[in-house]
Amino acid sequence: MKHPPCSVVAAATAILAVVLAIGGCSTEGDAGKASDTAATASNGDAAMLLKQATDAMRKVTGMHVRLAVTGDVPNLRVTKLEGDISNTPQTVATGSATLLVGNKSEDAKFVYVDGHLYSDLGQPGTYTDFGNGTSIYNVSVLLDPNKGLANLLANLKDASVAGSQQADGVATTKITGNSSADDIATLAGSRLTSEDVKTVPTTVWIASDGSSHLVQIQIAPTKDTSVTLTMSDWGKQVTATKPV
């Protein structure tokens, strides 16, 4: 069987590293500062809301995800992604993505099942087995209570409530703060900042309907860039079969 070009393999790898990878949030512009008085008053509320969101996220075993990237984010070839993922009884993901292959933008569908990533990248309608996904990126990390989105919520620093806002049609409370660059790298599968950067501006939108679900998260890895992950259908069970 003919092996796909290196550029295609790299792009397929990027699908994995984003499928469930980036769940980060908030642009520098979004992380606006409230007055000192308001900030002091909102810190306690932010801590409580983040605790509730962390607990809720740790219980999520499946969901729909939508990724959007603005600007040229270091080490990130995926510019857009939408799909479903669940980790019970095993990690399964399906969806579509837009990636940079060389200097060209290409659309591809993907299926992650039985520890393998299948994609029609470079060959629309014809799926290639890109091997054991866990050897490239541990796709279950997004829902991992200790390394994934729950960990990011639990360790958000300098958190402050920035008001109420509709996110993806859901009423939410917006919270701004900073995430560890190392935590972002763990979640993304690669470092999105230079080695000397310690924190990444992060914004989260938490559902205010009592569920405390994380609706959206955005990070600003470098100047004029952002990575936004929007979630819905929490608890969704995803099934998939190996593409023929």
UniProtKB/Swiss-Prot annotation:
Lipid moiety-binding residues (N-palmitoyl cysteine): 25
Classification via Pfam families: LppX_LprAFG (PF07161)
Membrane topology category: Lipid-anchor
Location of this chain's protein in the cell: Cell membrane
Endpoints of the signal sequence: 1-24
Chief place of localization: membrane
Highest taxon of source: Bacteria
Gene Ontology cellular component annotations, sorted alphabetically: plasma membrane
UniProt-listed InterPro entries: LolA/LolB/LppX, LppX/LprAFG
Sequence similarity: Belongs to the LppX/LprAFG lipoprotein family.
Protein name, per record: Putative lipoprotein LprA
Protein source organism: Mycobacterium bovis (strain ATCC BAA-935 / AF2122/97)
